[in-house]
Amino acid sequence: MMKSIPVWKQELSDGVHAARLASLYCCAPAETASKAARYAAVLDGLEKTFGFHAEAGLYSAPGRTEIGGNHTDHQHGRVLAGSVNIDMIAAAAPNDKNQLRVQSEGYDLCVIDLNDLEARKDEENTTAALLRGECAAFAQRGAKLAGLDVYISSNVPKGSGVSSSAAFEVLIGVILNDCFMTEKVSPIAIAQIGQWAENVYFGKPCGLMDQMASSVGNIITIDFASPAKPVVEPVAVDFSKAGLALCILDSGADHADLTDEYAAIPAECRAVAAVCGGEVLRDVPFETFLAKLPECRRQCGDRAVLRAFHVYADNDRVAKQVAALHDGDFDTFLCLVNESGRSSWEYLQNVIPAGYKEHQEVGVTIAAAKHLLGDKGAVRVHGGGFAGTVQAFVPVEMLDEFKAGMEAILGEGRCHVLSIRPEGGAVL
């Protein structure tokens, strides 16, 4: 929704949007002044970067937390995930240049010619590829694209394990949907567009969980048995009422140069599925996999087989986690989270990159968190793994001590205490 920039700024200053911001950021309306100031700042950034605009729109897309189903999405499995109260926000306004111009704070300006939306090999692994791919996808759905200037600010740390890339894709999707689609596409479709752009234009074979959690919002369970029509169901749970805090621990490891590690997981799982007569593991009954185990080992190698064991088990765990949450059985839920974490490390092997000896940051983070929690709470690798973050569910009475202990090991600001955001991609 477009408004004049002075009107936006006055409304933000006067607290007109306080209730909306309180919902998005899981805080009281009286605590939203700093949130409103962020939106005023992106309006300033828009004008400083691109010059005067008569009107603009304001948008938000949250980071996400994966709660269950580690690397199950690309095998058409089940996941449990939620949106969190850190996000990317943007101000967007029309331009007359037939270009999509995107300025993210701290990055170079990215410009896409809307007359040229074909995928480019030399653009793979770049922001331009994601933008071009999303524009192409919306154009295919009937969007009448026109010039647009976008200024983005983020408090979703890159490589943080809460998926800054998915938040970016969803944010662009929300903007394009609001500005150019007469018949709006659904949050599910926005997620699918982001995944398609990342797969086809960016060149990364990601699953759909990250984009779906950011786009749909709140806590959801998703069944990807039919990827074109994933089944999305809300899961009503309030971790704070259960006495649990959600912490995301930044291990300090870098995602750089790990694309091959990530890509190997779906590739190896698909190789196992192929031996068993399927395309992905969801196509293959577990009993068939067991019967074909010797052949899978010969053709795919033992690491691929162990990864398949993980995917089957974690897929089943998601259903058990959802049932436990529905029943309010948090002890069982936490046991399942810990089981998933052990399986990821031992079978999926996405905690330590192959051959790394001196740098095993995610492993150290898990070990330290488990030591501080003892037999309480739960700890697991978070998201894609290898680098980035660890997830911990911490009893609230232990939170201050846990946070201080982890930051003494990892560094100040490395323990993020988050809340589940009730809404996904949003137009303010």
Name each region found by the language model.
Residues R78-D96, V216:
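Structural signature of FAD isoalloxazine-binding scaffolds in flavoprotein oxidoreductases
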Residues S83-N85, V162-T182:
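DPxDG-like acidic metal-binding loop motif
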Residues S60-H76, N155-L171, D375-F393:
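Glycine/serine-rich anion-binding loops at beta->alpha junctions
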Residues M1-R64, I89, A93-E124, T221-R380, ...:
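C-terminal nucleotide
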Residues R101-Q103, G147-S154, K184-W196, L334-E339, ...:
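Beta-strand segments within the central parallel beta-sheet cores of soluble alpha/beta enzyme folds
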Residues C135-P157:
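Glycine- and acidic-rich phosphate- and metal-coordinating loops
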Residues Q140-L148, L176-I190, V396-I409:
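Phosphate-handling active-site elements
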